[in-house]
UniProtKB/Swiss-Prot annotation:
Keyword match Nucleus: yes
Residue numbers of Phosphothreonine PTMs: 245, 349, 363, 366, 813, 815, 818, 833
Region (Domain A): 366-572
PTM-bearing positions, type N6-methyllysine: 802, 852
Species: Rattus norvegicus (Rat)
Record's protein name: Retinoblastoma-associated protein
Residue positions where N6-acetyllysine is found in the record: 865-866
Record family assignment: Belongs to the retinoblastoma protein (RB) family.
Compositionally biased tracts (Basic and acidic residues): 345-355, 907-920
Domain of life: Eukaryota
Length: 920
């Protein structure tokens, strides 16, 4: 408990010191009810500042006692108080905050606490990171930080925008009572009230910014023309162009309110200037903002709402929420100031070393501008798309044995109703139309990607009957969910950040809305990325993070279909039911399609013969399906690929952790990986309702223990917390048994060690188990090497396309960007006729004849001194630019063949010389 105020009594014998508290689990939450509230005697301990701080914040006794116990634990940590004296007061404030949140007793606002300990938002949260807190506190801090970030970005945007709209020194004749600063203040507080009323989700950036544009439109119409800059002055002139008098000014708001609903010229100008979708902003304007303004009932003064009246209205909201007083942004209060280097405020581009190029530097984007740009990019793709199936899709539907069109349309309609209701429930009931707009975009993307997938499958299999795939409900729900996730992420900040710091609509929200299992959603991600070429780099990263979330925990939930699939595969294939360990060192194949993933199990690749068909029109879906099932045992493509990706993700994280903790014992990494991989393959039940990283940390601790390496679990947890994806709940709240959770140390002792004790002890013996191969780690599953691959024994080089997309939306393919594209072969694209192959064969034959004649004449072609590249104008000095494409190709073939012939002759001569020497 905190110290009591000192008494004025005679000196007495000091009480005996209290017994030392038991050592707490560093990774374990402390439940509020479990902490002992032992009343200690603090008469001789003078901490008047702590007492004064609690009194100033009106902290109740039980909260003060909890805060003091928290302070005792915090102050015992080595180095926590190093730096400066002020840090002690700040830590007291943090301990009071922690106690108040844990006990659900918050007698003060967050801003009042900041003012009392004189610290900024970021300083407060940085200090809080040094303390192990409960999940409850973590969630409260996360909510506050996200709200602050959004408010900070929006105020910065409003301040800059008002500077572009209003004149700081207007012409004479304007009342001195009205100025740009006053308009900024009333605009900001009106926006705060509107945001609290309309947007239920505090950290939504896009809807909030659209609402801000509505507020700006409202006050532009209320402002006198002499205060406005162009083009806003011209847009607002028909409304506020008449001269003002004090009496007329008093009735101005009522007069303009009648014109608000019909006049949208100002808001159209605002949308154009900020590159916003005008239809979306108008929807917010008519459905949300105008009803809010009508119900506000604020008093007008000089044509503008009274600042004092607005501020008093906001005061009530602020005191009720107990968090940030956003009015302080207007004063640039130090408690709300960001750090000098703040990644949220602007996405800064690196400074160029050449000062002459300073003028050409890219202007850094604010968070609002960044999100608006990503939305604009999505609109470019989807504006020309339809929210109904295209003629090509309808043709595919008609070619199916069972036409899926009716079911697809009904599914889209039914899911739409569910989506809009869930969206409105999360964001605000007034935003149901916004949800409808976003769902419409998702449906457009859904049909677009579906058509691309079917075209790709048609080219690959030469069939048009996809009845089985197109009548698969899970496939459609997964594809629709992925399209909606792309749209939702585009409109939120979660794409730019870690998923855990996103909004309430962040992944896996869409899975809950559609009642879709994460493992089924995972199956479509890779195919979605491959066929939709216009996805931005950031969106591909976002989908990759979604895939990681699924692989690390979401796919391992107890109701996941993954466990049934593992069991079926195990029963069918015996001990090698999962991905073979020997295949881990092989590169990950990236040629899986949606049909492979959703129509598996298919025949095991090891027992499957490979056939190549060119221009085969007689191939049907039935024949293809029967070919898949002619041999047994069956193997699930989706399960095999899932385990390969899980192994690679697991090893990558383990490798990072080992580099930080076991750099002096590099040989242990392979042993830890073997135990880790063995657990995932043979003890996969341990993953049920748990996290991949929990098994990783337990594997590391177990091997270090048996190898007599002094590595405490606390050290492992501390290093793990520094990983970019880490969450405290991963090691604080681990499933022990049904509905019972505890720390990761308890899980290791009572569950992990009990299950794997025999296996772990084997690594201490003289004959340890065979080590598992290290997985092949590509840079990314969705990035392909651009280096050509030479096929052994031939003069053929295979190089991937520079980009996977085909002709779409007027964008050129990589082959179109190559001057000699007519002699390039793109495997997987529509080849047209066989003329191309015949032309290549003819070139090869002609080059062979040229080589023979050259060899007979004794004048082989002279090899080039340097390589020629497929770029127009390269090597102009030797005249190659003026050669026709066929002649260049022949010359290259001749040069390559000549070089190989000379190398073979040289090798043969060397062999003969060696044999002659041996004979001698």
């Amino acid at each position: 408990m905190p110290p009591k105020a000192p008494r004025r009594t005679a000196a007495a014998e000091p009480p005996p010191p209290p017994p030392p508290p038991p050592e707490d689990d560093p990774a374990q939450d402390s439940d509020p009810e479990e902490l002992p509230l032992i009343r200690l005697e603090f008469e001789k301990i003078e901490e008047p500042e702590f007492i004064a701080l609690c009194q100033k914040l009106k902290v109740p006794d039980h909260v003060r006692e909890r805060a003091w116990l928290t302070w005792e634990k915090v102050s015992s940590v080595d180095g926590i108080l190093e730096g400066y004296i002020q840090k002690k007061k700040e830590l007291w404030g943090i301990c009071i905050f922690i106690a108040a949140v844990d006990l659900d007793e918050m007698p003060f606002t967050f801003t009042e606490l900041q003012k009392s300990i004189e610290t900024s938002v970021y300083k407060f949260f940085d200090l809080l990171k040094e303390i192990d807190t409960s999940t409850k506190v973590d969630n409260a801090v996360s909510r506050l930080l996200k709200k602050y970030n959004v408010l900070c970005a929006l105020y910065s945007k409003l301040e800059r925008t008002c500077g572009l709209i209003y004149l700081t020194q207007p012409s004479s004749g304007l009342s001195t009572e009205i100025n740009s600063m006053l308009v900024l203040k009333v605009s900001w507080i009106t926006f705060l009230l509107a945001k609290g009323e309309v947007v239920q989700m505090e950290d939504d950036l896009v809807i909030s910014f659209q609402l801000m544009l509505c507020v700006l439109d409202y006050f532009i119409k209320l402002s006198p023309p002499a205060l406005l800059r162009e083009p806003y002055k011209t847009a607002a002139t028909p409304i506020n162009g008449s001269p003002r008098t004090p009496r007329r000014g008093q009735n101005r708001s009522a007069r303009i309110a009648k014109q608000l609903e019909s006049d949208t010229r100002t808001i159209e100008v605002l949308c154009k200037e900020h590159e916003c979708n005008v239809d979306e902003v108008k929807n917010v304007y008519f459905k949300n903002f105008i009803p809010f303004i009508s119900s506000l009932g604020i008093v007008s003064s000089n044509g503008l709402p009274e600042l004092e009246s607005l501020s008093k209205r906001y005061e009530e909201v602020y005191l009720k929420s107990k968090d940030l007083d956003a009015r302080l942004f207007l004063d640039h209060d130090k408690t709300l100031q960001t750090d000098t280097i703040d990644s949220f405020e602007t996405e800064r581009t690196p400074r160029k070393s050449n000062p002459d190029e300073e003028a050409n530097m890219v202007t850094p984007h604010t968070p609002v501008r960044t999100v608006m740009n990503t939305i604009q990019q999505l609109m470019v793709i989807l504006n020309s798309a339809s929210d109904q199936p295209s003629e090509n899709l309808i043709s595919y539907f008609s070619n199916c044995t069972v036409n899926p069109k009716e079911n697809i349309l009904k599914r889209v309609k039914d899911v739409g109703h569910i989506f809009k209701e869930k969206f409105a429930s999360a964001v605000g009931q007034g935003c149901i139309d916004i949800g409808a707009q976003r769902y419409k975009l998702g449906v457009r993307l859904y049909y677009r990607v579906m058509e691309s997938m079917l075209k790709s499958e048609e080219e690959r299999l030469s069939i048009q009957n996809f009845s089985k795939l197109l009548n698969d409900n899970i496939f459609h729900m997964s594809l629709l969910a992925c399209a909606l996730e792309v749209v939702m992420a585009t409109y939120s900040r979660s794409m730019l950040q870690n998923l855990d710091s996103g909004t309430d609509l962040s992944f896996p929200w869409i899975l809950n809305v559609l009642n879709l299992k994460a493992f089924d959603f995972y199956k479509v991600i890779e195919s979605f990325i491959k066929v939709e070429a216009n996805l931005t780099r950031e969106m591909i990263k976002h989908l990759e993070r979604c895939e990681h979330r699924i692989m690390e925990s979401l796919a391992w939930l107890s109701d996941s279909p993954l466990f049934d699939l593992i069991k079926q595969s195990k029963d069918g294939e015996g001990p090698d039911h999962l991905e073979s360990a020997c295949s881990l060192s092989l590169p990950l194949q990236s040629n899986h399609t949606a049909a492979d993933m959703y129509l598996s199990p298919i025949r095991s690749p090891k027992k499957r013969t490979s056939t190549t068909r060119v221009n085969s029109a007689a191939n049907t879906e039935t024949q293809a399906a029967s070919a898949f099932h002619t041999q047994k045992p069956l193997k699930s493509t989706s399960l095999s690929l899932f385990y390969k990706k899980v192994y690679r993700l697991a090893y990558l994280r383990l490798n990072t952790l080992c580099a930080r903790l076991l750099s002096d014992h590099p040989e242990l990494e392979h042993i830890i990986w073997t135990l880790f991989q063995h657990t995932l393959e043979n003890e996969y039940e341990l993953m049920k309702d748990r996290h991949l990283d929990q098994i990783m940390m337990c594997s590391m601790y177990g091997i270090c223990k048996v190898k007599n390496i002094d590595l405490k679990f606390k050290i492992i947890v501390t290093a793990y917390k520094d990983l970019p994806h880490a969450a405290q709940e991963t090691f604080k709240r681990v499933l022990i048994r049904e509905e019972e959770f505890d720390s990761i140390i308890v899980f290791y002792n009572s569950v992990f060690m009990q299950r794997l004790k025999t296996n772990i002890l084997q690594y201490a013996s003289t004959r340890p188990p065979t080590l598992s191969p290290i997985p092949h780690i590509p840079r990314s599953p969705y990035k392909f090497s651009s280096s050509p691959l030479r096929i052994p024994g031939g003069n053929i080089y295979i190089s991937p396309l520079k980009s996977p997309y085909k002709i779409s939306e007027g964008l050129p393919t990589p082959t179109k960007m190559t001057p000699r594209s007519r002699i390039l072969v793109s495997i997987g694209e529509s080849f047209g006729t066989s003329e191309k192959f015949q032309k290549i064969n003819q070139m090869v034959c002609n080059s062979d004849r040229v080589l023979k004649r050259s060899a007979e004449g004794g004048n082989p072609p002279k090899p080039l001194k340097k390589l020629r590249f497929d770029i127009e104008g390269s090597d102009e000095a030797d005249g190659s630019k003026h050669l026709p494409a066929e002649s260049k190709f022949q010359q290259k073939l001749a040069e390559m063949t000549s070089t190989r012939t000379r190398m073979q002759k040289q090798k043969l001569n060397d062999s003969m010389e060696i044999s002659n020497k041996e004979e001698k």
